[in-house]
Curated annotation (Swiss-Prot):
Protein name per UniProt: 2-succinyl-5-enolpyruvyl-6-hydroxy-3-cyclohexene-1-carboxylate synthase
A Pfam match: TPP_enzyme_N
Entries under PANTHER family matching the protein: 2-SUCCINYL-5-ENOLPYRUVYL-6-HYDROXY-3-CYCLOHEXENE-1-CARBOXYLATE SYNTHASE, PROTEIN PHYLLO, CHLOROPLASTIC
Domain of life: Bacteria
Stored HAMAP family: MenD (MF_01659)
Cofactor binding mode and count: Binds 1 thiamine pyrophosphate per subunit.
Family: Belongs to the TPP enzyme family. MenD subfamily.
Pathway: Quinol/quinone metabolism; 1,4-dihydroxy-2-naphthoate biosynthesis; 1,4-dihydroxy-2-naphthoate from chorismate: step 2/7; Quinol/quinone metabolism; menaquinone biosynthesis
Record GO terms (molecular function): 2-succinyl-5-enolpyruvyl-6-hydroxy-3-cyclohexene-1-carboxylic-acid synthase activity; magnesium ion binding; manganese ion binding; thiamine pyrophosphate binding
Cofactor(s) needed for function: Mg(2+); Mn(2+); thiamine diphosphate
UniProt KW Manganese keyword: yes
Organism this protein belongs to: Bacillus pumilus (strain SAFR-032)
EC number per UniProt: 2.2.1.9
NCBIfam families: menD
Amino acid sequence: MNNQIMTTYIGRLMDEFVQGGVQEAVVCPGSRSTPLAMLALAHQDINVHVLVDERSAAFYALGLAKASQTPVLLICTSGTAAANFYPAIVEAHYSRVPLIVLTADRPHELREVGAPQAIDQQFLFGKFVKWFTDLALPEESQMMLRYVQTAAARANHMSMQEPKGPVQINVPLREPLLPDLSIHPFDREETDRKKVLATGQAYPNDDALSEIVTVMNRSKKGLIVCGELHTQKEKEAVLRLSKDLHLPILADPLSHLRNGHEHAELIIDAYDSLLKDEALQQHLLPDMVIRFGPMPVSKPLFKWLEKHAEVNQIVVDAAGGFRDPGLSASYIIESDVAAFVDEVVNRADQREDTSFLNRWQHANSSFRTHASHYSDEDLSFEGNVYRQLQHLLPKESVLFIGNSMPIRDVDTFFEAQSKPFRMMANRGANGIDGVVSTALGTYAALKQPVTLVIGDLSFYHDMNGLLAAKLMDIPLTVVLLNNDGGGIFSFLPQASEEPYYEKLFGTPTGLNFEYASKLYGGTYSKPSTKQEFHDVYKAHIEEPGLHLIEIETDRHSRVSKHRQMMDDILEEVKKECLLS
């Protein structure tokens, strides 16, 4: 292959990505991907991040794209390199994150003939990518340059079209693989030619709106349930709906509604705990629910909504996805959040009755008041770590939350507050893998201090992700809650099967994580008191570099402490709310 032809062809591909909004590329080293990697680096408008492990790199790219909500290039060589992207692609699919995966490949004549480092990369990621194409080999005709430009434009468009998600372009390349950078590989300035594929905004159907407004006007006990939101516009729209119609908001931590605004009185942050009690479930039962975003993390909330399918439940989803795991939705409305709110607020009757909002506020306030009476000194009880951490986080920072117990504990213990910070997590497929790398990617996008709170098994899964912190000088403060195993299983029925539990589910590793931090050039601390944790965290969060703060907790006693605390608090809440 003439390397000037190849250079122009791949250069046109890269330049069109930039035209479509791409600014970042994550590159994994390899030979067959040489033209893709070098021309990405050569483009003045692409910022290239190089990571040597494909699984970590893919999650890092996921973090970049999740935080920026713009497409990120993810580049690898042929063979099993691309297969290591798979877990992150699955997460991107389910969490609706735009990724453009460029998998270099052998030319067609070297496929299925036993050539080295050649696997079948056609539709490698199956239904987890929105679009796939296998590029033609580079040619020099204007038609083929328009062809490769169109492929890039289409990839940009498809990744950003709702629901956002990953796409794959398979790029076969013949040797020689070194591009000729002496020519001008990006000819936009010469041709001023680009493709524009514009995405639209979903607006609610007028007939459906009329029916929904009728339901809203009849409702006396309306409620908003809010899962993960991505934009300030969405956040402001939900707050407007709540204020205008006096609807309490049950706000998931990832909704960005528990912090960063001055309307904490509208936010119910203790619903996960309140809905564990049957009497309170009935006391707080609505006659209408409007849900934005995916289902929140709270299992009691999910089971409550599932049980009460007789209640009108309206799900608003800009992509029209069927995100209704309880099969209890009465309406699924494909609409932009702000557009939906504008329409229903303008059409719905004005209401003055705040009694149902007050009922929720009373229960929420009662729970938080009684919870504050419990000592938060004992760090071996994980809840106390979260109760303290919420006050330590700096303004304009990011809390990246691990799956399994951390996201549930944040849901339980983090209260609504005005301090602005982001809470993020991988809640598409809810896996415990790739969390460290994703958190590092969020810093690369936002350049804000990042605190990662994570369990020991999840941290172990992605320890090699810490290499990015070392090589790219990314500051990261890790709060590692080490209960030496799978703590979440202690809350599940498996815990009652003592002969099997510890070996199959508890899975203690006995690892000394101090060595992991030192391996990647980080600091290590192991506070045992509230004051020590405060001092160590404050000393490190604004500093450059990797900082590992390990807190040993006890998963064996945690369950009984947690349940006893909840039982005691809920009894007090019921006395105040049901008997007053």
